[in-house]
Amino acid sequence: MSSFTIPSPSSFSLSNSYNQTSPHSFTLRNSRSNFEFHRLRLDVESRRRSTSLRSNCSTKGTDSGENENKSVLDAFFLGKALAEVINERIESTVGEVLSTIGKFQAEQQKQVQEIQEEVLERAKKAKERAARETMEEQGLVASKPVAITRNPDAVVVASVTSTSTVESKTIMVDVEESSSSSDED
Protein backbone atom coordinates (compact mmCIF):
# COMPACT_ATOMS: atom_id res chain seq x y z
CA MET A 1 0.00 0.00 0.00
CA SER A 2 1.38 3.44 -0.87
CA SER A 3 0.34 6.67 0.77
CA PHE A 4 1.23 10.34 0.65
CA THR A 5 0.07 13.55 2.31
CA ILE A 6 -1.75 16.27 0.41
CA PRO A 7 -0.86 19.79 1.62
CA SER A 8 -3.96 21.66 2.79
CA PRO A 9 -5.16 23.64 5.85
CA SER A 10 -5.66 20.40 7.72
CA SER A 11 -3.53 17.35 7.12
CA PHE A 12 -4.89 14.53 4.97
CA SER A 13 -3.41 11.30 3.86
CA LEU A 14 -4.17 9.59 0.59
CA SER A 15 -3.44 5.93 0.22
CA ASN A 16 -3.78 3.54 -2.69
CA SER A 17 -3.85 -0.21 -2.22
CA TYR A 18 -2.28 -1.88 -5.22
CA ASN A 19 -3.99 -5.16 -4.43
CA GLN A 20 -7.45 -3.66 -5.02
CA THR A 21 -9.30 -4.33 -8.26
CA SER A 22 -8.97 -0.78 -9.60
CA PRO A 23 -5.61 0.99 -9.91
CA HIS A 24 -7.40 4.24 -9.06
CA SER A 25 -8.95 3.27 -5.73
CA PHE A 26 -8.04 5.54 -2.81
CA THR A 27 -8.84 6.12 0.84
CA LEU A 28 -8.72 9.72 2.11
CA ARG A 29 -8.32 10.33 5.85
CA ASN A 30 -8.07 13.41 7.99
CA SER A 31 -5.70 12.89 10.89
CA ARG A 32 -7.37 15.62 12.99
CA SER A 33 -10.82 14.11 12.91
CA ASN A 34 -12.25 10.70 12.33
CA PHE A 35 -13.60 11.55 8.88
CA GLU A 36 -12.74 9.18 6.01
CA PHE A 37 -13.59 8.53 2.39
CA HIS A 38 -13.45 4.75 1.97
CA ARG A 39 -13.02 3.01 -1.32
CA LEU A 40 -12.82 6.22 -3.26
CA ARG A 41 -12.62 4.97 -6.80
CA LEU A 42 -11.90 6.79 -10.04
CA ASP A 43 -12.73 4.85 -13.19
CA VAL A 44 -11.66 6.27 -16.53
CA GLU A 45 -12.80 4.31 -19.55
CA SER A 46 -11.25 5.51 -22.79
CA ARG A 47 -13.51 3.38 -24.97
CA ARG A 48 -16.67 5.09 -23.77
CA ARG A 49 -14.92 8.34 -22.79
CA SER A 50 -16.50 8.32 -19.37
CA THR A 51 -15.19 9.07 -15.92
CA SER A 52 -16.92 8.04 -12.74
CA LEU A 53 -16.11 8.73 -9.12
CA ARG A 54 -17.52 6.56 -6.33
CA SER A 55 -16.90 6.86 -2.61
CA ASN A 56 -18.15 5.85 0.81
CA CYS A 57 -17.97 8.42 3.62
CA SER A 58 -17.98 7.76 7.32
CA THR A 59 -17.00 9.31 10.61
CA LYS A 60 -15.90 7.41 13.65
CA GLY A 61 -17.48 8.20 16.98
CA THR A 62 -20.29 10.59 17.87
CA ASP A 63 -20.34 14.16 16.62
CA SER A 64 -21.37 17.21 18.55
CA GLY A 65 -22.23 20.49 16.79
CA GLU A 66 -18.62 21.68 16.70
CA ASN A 67 -17.30 18.34 15.50
CA GLU A 68 -19.98 18.29 12.83
CA ASN A 69 -18.77 21.65 11.50
CA LYS A 70 -15.22 20.33 11.49
CA SER A 71 -16.39 17.27 9.63
CA VAL A 72 -18.09 19.41 6.99
CA LEU A 73 -14.94 21.50 6.57
CA ASP A 74 -12.85 18.35 6.47
CA ALA A 75 -15.13 16.88 3.82
CA PHE A 76 -14.79 20.10 1.81
CA PHE A 77 -11.01 20.05 1.98
CA LEU A 78 -10.91 16.33 1.26
CA GLY A 79 -13.06 16.93 -1.82
CA LYS A 80 -10.82 19.80 -2.85
CA ALA A 81 -7.71 17.64 -2.43
CA LEU A 82 -9.35 14.86 -4.37
CA ALA A 83 -10.26 17.25 -7.19
CA GLU A 84 -6.65 18.45 -7.33
CA VAL A 85 -5.36 14.88 -7.55
CA ILE A 86 -7.85 14.05 -10.28
CA ASN A 87 -6.96 17.23 -12.20
CA GLU A 88 -3.26 16.39 -11.96
CA ARG A 89 -3.93 12.89 -13.29
CA ILE A 90 -6.03 14.25 -16.14
CA GLU A 91 -3.45 16.94 -16.97
CA SER A 92 -0.73 14.31 -16.95
CA THR A 93 -2.70 12.02 -19.24
CA VAL A 94 -3.64 14.86 -21.58
CA GLY A 95 0.00 15.96 -21.66
CA GLU A 96 1.12 12.47 -22.61
CA VAL A 97 -1.53 12.26 -25.34
CA LEU A 98 -0.56 15.66 -26.74
CA SER A 99 3.10 14.67 -26.64
CA THR A 100 2.35 11.51 -28.59
CA ILE A 101 0.30 13.46 -31.12
CA GLY A 102 3.18 15.93 -31.49
CA LYS A 103 5.62 13.09 -32.17
CA PHE A 104 3.29 11.62 -34.80
CA GLN A 105 2.94 15.03 -36.45
CA ALA A 106 6.72 15.51 -36.50
CA GLU A 107 7.21 12.08 -38.10
CA GLN A 108 4.51 12.81 -40.66
CA GLN A 109 6.06 16.20 -41.49
CA LYS A 110 9.45 14.55 -41.94
CA GLN A 111 7.95 11.97 -44.31
CA VAL A 112 6.21 14.73 -46.29
CA GLN A 113 9.50 16.62 -46.64
CA GLU A 114 11.30 13.47 -47.81
CA ILE A 115 8.60 12.83 -50.42
CA GLN A 116 8.77 16.46 -51.59
CA GLU A 117 12.56 16.23 -51.96
CA GLU A 118 12.25 12.99 -53.92
CA VAL A 119 9.61 14.50 -56.23
CA LEU A 120 11.77 17.57 -56.86
CA GLU A 121 14.80 15.38 -57.59
CA ARG A 122 12.82 13.25 -60.05
CA ALA A 123 11.41 16.37 -61.73
CA LYS A 124 14.92 17.79 -62.13
CA LYS A 125 16.17 14.54 -63.69
CA ALA A 126 13.16 14.40 -66.03
CA LYS A 127 13.78 18.01 -67.10
CA GLU A 128 17.45 17.28 -67.82
CA ARG A 129 16.53 14.13 -69.75
CA ALA A 130 13.94 16.03 -71.84
CA ALA A 131 16.45 18.79 -72.62
CA ARG A 132 19.07 16.24 -73.68
CA GLU A 133 16.56 14.41 -75.91
CA THR A 134 15.53 17.69 -77.54
CA MET A 135 19.16 18.57 -78.27
CA GLU A 136 19.75 15.09 -79.72
CA GLU A 137 16.74 15.50 -82.02
CA GLN A 138 18.07 18.84 -83.23
CA GLY A 139 21.45 17.26 -83.84
CA LEU A 140 23.35 19.50 -81.46
CA VAL A 141 24.62 16.62 -79.36
CA ALA A 142 25.58 13.07 -80.29
CA SER A 143 23.02 10.57 -79.10
CA LYS A 144 25.68 8.34 -77.62
CA PRO A 145 29.12 9.39 -76.50
CA VAL A 146 31.79 8.16 -78.96
CA ALA A 147 35.08 6.89 -77.64
CA ILE A 148 38.04 8.31 -79.56
CA THR A 149 41.20 6.21 -79.70
CA ARG A 150 44.33 7.97 -80.78
CA ASN A 151 47.17 6.39 -82.66
CA PRO A 152 50.34 8.51 -82.35
CA ASP A 153 51.81 7.14 -85.64
CA ALA A 154 48.77 8.03 -87.76
CA VAL A 155 48.73 11.14 -89.93
CA VAL A 156 45.96 13.55 -89.09
CA VAL A 157 44.17 15.18 -92.02
CA ALA A 158 42.85 18.55 -91.03
CA SER A 159 40.25 18.95 -93.75
CA VAL A 160 38.93 16.88 -96.61
CA THR A 161 36.79 18.37 -99.38
CA SER A 162 34.86 16.12 -101.64
CA THR A 163 33.84 17.18 -105.10
CA SER A 164 31.09 15.61 -107.04
CA THR A 165 31.56 14.19 -110.56
CA VAL A 166 29.47 16.98 -112.11
CA GLU A 167 31.79 19.61 -110.68
CA SER A 168 34.79 17.67 -111.95
CA LYS A 169 33.46 17.60 -115.55
CA THR A 170 32.68 21.29 -115.46
CA ILE A 171 36.16 22.07 -114.39
CA MET A 172 37.60 19.88 -117.13
CA VAL A 173 35.45 21.50 -119.82
CA ASP A 174 36.45 24.96 -118.76
CA VAL A 175 40.06 24.00 -118.87
CA GLU A 176 39.75 22.57 -122.40
CA GLU A 177 37.89 25.58 -123.74
CA SER A 178 40.38 27.95 -122.34
CA SER A 179 43.25 25.99 -123.86
CA SER A 180 41.62 25.84 -127.32
CA SER A 181 40.91 29.54 -127.33
CA SER A 182 44.51 30.21 -126.55
CA ASP A 183 45.49 28.02 -129.53
CA GLU A 184 43.46 30.17 -131.90
CA ASP A 185 45.35 33.28 -131.03
Swiss-Prot record:
An example of a Gene Ontology BP annotation on this entry?
A: thylakoid membrane organization
Q: Where is the composition biased (Polar residues)?
A: 52-64
Predominant location: plastid
- The positions making up the signal sequence are none
Keyword 4Fe-4S listed: no
Read off the PANTHER family from this record: BNACNNG14650D PROTEIN (PTHR35745), OS04G0513000 PROTEIN (PTHR35745:SF1)
**Protein's recorded name:** Uncharacterized protein At4g13200, chloroplastic
Instruction: Record the organism.
Output: Arabidopsis thaliana (Mouse-ear cress)
